[in-house]
Amino acid sequence: MITMQEIFNEISKNGGLTPSRKVKEIAERFPEKIAFRNKEFGIWHQISYEEFWNQAQYVGNALKFYGVGPKDKVAVHSENRPEWIITDIGIQAIQSITVGLYPTNPSPEVKYLLGHSESKVLFAEDQEQVDKVLEVIEHLPSLSKIVYFESRGITRYDNEKLISWDEFIEIGKEEYKKDKDFVIKMQDEIKSEDTAIMIYTSGTTGPPKGSMLTHGNLEWVATQIPELSFTTGVDNPQYLSYLPLCHVFGRLVDLIIGIHTMGTINFAESIDTVQTDLAEVQPSVFPAVPRILERMHAGALVRMKDASKLKQLLFSLASKLGDITAKRRLEMGERDFIARVTNFIAQLLGFRALRKKLGLLNVDNALSGAAPISPEILRFFMSLGVPIYEGYGMTENSAIATGNRPGKVKLGTVGVAQPGVELKLADDGEILIKHPGVFKGYFKNEEATKEVIDNNGWLYTGDVGEYDGEFLKIVDRKKDIIITSGGKNVSPSEIENNVKTSP
């Protein structure tokens, strides 16, 4: 079996691949390697990379059968599950474009997103999502087929556009038999400038905009994996998929990093069972949003408050040692000898047991992104022996911009520029980013595209930043900055973080 260092060496030498090409490569080299684990009714089911690639090819062939071709849009409206990523790979492999919808999107938003994207086929998770689209189906002339993953409650529906996942895959198998090289031929013709996925971002002054990320964007991100601050050095890494796959953060971790590191993606049973699933899976990598980390922090404190007097005493001693560990690592670096000793003792006193309950026992690298987080929350996890590196990115730059990294951490900042990233501040403090991962533009909105990408390729992020030494600090969204009567600029997010950690 291949080691992580060997994987990194291969990427450094040959570069990354588009997601579909990487899946094909792994399926050919390591067919029995486990790609997915999915929990249903308390039982874990496994899917190998060989089966993953085969099913993706069946998806591509079935889409061709229904008239889907290059540049056509295909939407997915579902919680995270193996079929989501299998479908995504199948769509991309035949040069079509994947459009993700949030499971919480109501009918009016489904109508807008499917209509604006001109999606030809929709993959819907269950009756709830099918009902949403059927409610507005007369407004969606481009939509020709609705494939549902779960059939409960739908089998009695009488609509010629509906087809089950199993039936769809069977059609794909039959088409595959007619031309086994179809998907591979389409895949070989992919150009780097072709759009691979479309991610809709909420509009504050208008409807959501469809950000077009190209195969070249995704390939460039994959090429950066050995140098990114939030990848793991652990062999056979385990991931827990719970961040929405229609969001760029979830897609970055699962679709690009998870697959390129040949990891196993474990799917949380639901967003409500994330904590339980974490404790069971014990992943190697933990990407998180502040809300999850805040909840874990609060839960740990409550757990200790309700513990026995002895456990409370041990936790208090471990916390004091953990504080020393965090302070030393921030000042002296990850390899500091004293920090190693204090962390070792703190783990014996109870932190190891707490990390296991939180599902962080095997995590050697964790990342916080997508929203600002309080430095106190980061300090808590660092004292626990789980350094969480805050990073910064957005849909329009493929989620790659800056990040704290081992040996280079400053709490309250989003770190330094990731390798291959050019960064500068405009005169008004707006953060400008330039790299090969900057998106192609907004779908059917050239005016908005010109507002955020200048003629030299610089992306205007809309975020205001400032430097703290060599580290970048996000002040706030440019449009959210409050100017007081005294002329002072005040950041609402800074006020929010102070409130969150206030007793």
Name each region found by the language model.
Residues 105-138, 221-240, 271-285, 357, ...:
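Conserved ATP-dependent adenylate/AMP-binding module captured primarily in the ANL superfamily
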Residues 66, 93-171:
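Structural core segment of the AMP-binding/adenylate-forming
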Residues 417-484:
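Conserved ATP-binding/catalytic segment of the ANL
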